[in-house]
Amino acid sequence: MKYFTIATVLTLASSALAAIRDVQLFAQSSNEEINNLGLISRREGAGVNYLFLASGAETLKFDDETFTIFSELQTGSTTARQSLVVSGGVVQLSVSGQPLHVEIAEDGSVKFAGSDSVAAAKNINDPYNYSKDSFAVVTNGGEGSIPFKIIAKFIGGGKSSSVTKHTEAPTTSPVYSNKTVTVFTTYCPESTTITLTICSEVCTPTVIETSGSVTVSSVLPSSSTEAPPKTSVAAPSTTAEAQTTAPVTSYEGGANEIVGGGSMAIALAAAAIGLVI
């Protein structure tokens, strides 16, 4: 008696989708005057915002497909993207210029071209003269500037790392479409092909006990908890032993009855004669 298991394995391949996440930037410095201050932007021109240090941090967006940091500028019914750029030695958000390629490490460290020389500086001669009272974020700051490191903190409890995108299993029940798969088995002397139809239900391993050949009509799991049905094919019956009595036709049977009846009559007659004598 042979046992075999039919199992259907469904592989869910999911592609990593680009994510845009909310992020805030902070200053990390040995100078307590600016340490832990947040980065905010202030409008300095058409579509241009310079970055400054403040007690709170502005929420920006990070695109982990293009590795850019940006904000969304509403202009009437349209939305323009102001990307993080460096222009004239000033770190800013702008609708023009080449967006910086930004990488955020596990510890939140922000790295881009010129990030190693970022500093806080005042009196940079900005258009609206905000730097008279606030520290502007610049690269290659001059005398009196305070170097610092930019640290990113994602909003919403996500991990800081964006260098590697992870693919996670879906949390909702997947929807399966009908499919036909072919499974090759090697439990028989000859190769056997079994075709299964996968329906909307999630199939589970089904054990079928069989001897000889068997046709599997369905392997869908039943809604009850009963054991799966067992299908068996009875072995062919053995050859009956040869009969020792020769076959008798109806005519021969009738003749035998007549002969038997005549013998009985003769015996009775003989008995009667004996009594008479």
From Swiss-Prot:
Polar residues bias locations: 234-246
Chaperone listed as a keyword: no
Glycan attachment points: N129, N178
Signal peptide: 1-18
Annotated localization: Secreted, Cell wall; Membrane
Gene Ontology, cellular component aspect: cell surface; extracellular region; hyphal cell wall; side of membrane; yeast-form cell wall
Region (Disordered): 219-246
Keyword terms of this UniProt record: Cell wall, Glycoprotein, GPI-anchor, Lipoprotein, Membrane, Secreted, Signal, Virulence
PTM comment, free text: The GPI-anchor is attached to the protein in the endoplasmic reticulum and serves to target the protein to the cell surface. There, the glucosamine-inositol phospholipid moiety is cleaved off and the GPI-modified mannoprotein is covalently attached via its lipidless GPI glycan remnant to the 1,6-beta-glucan of the outer cell wall layer.
Record propeptide residues: 254-277
Primary site of residence: secreted
Presence of keyword Glycoprotein: yes
Family, as annotated: Belongs to the SRP1/TIP1 family.
Summary of the function given for this chain in its UniProt record: Component of the cell wall involved in virulence which plays a role in the relationship between C.albicans and the host.
The protein, known as: Cell wall protein PGA30
Encoding gene per record: PGA30
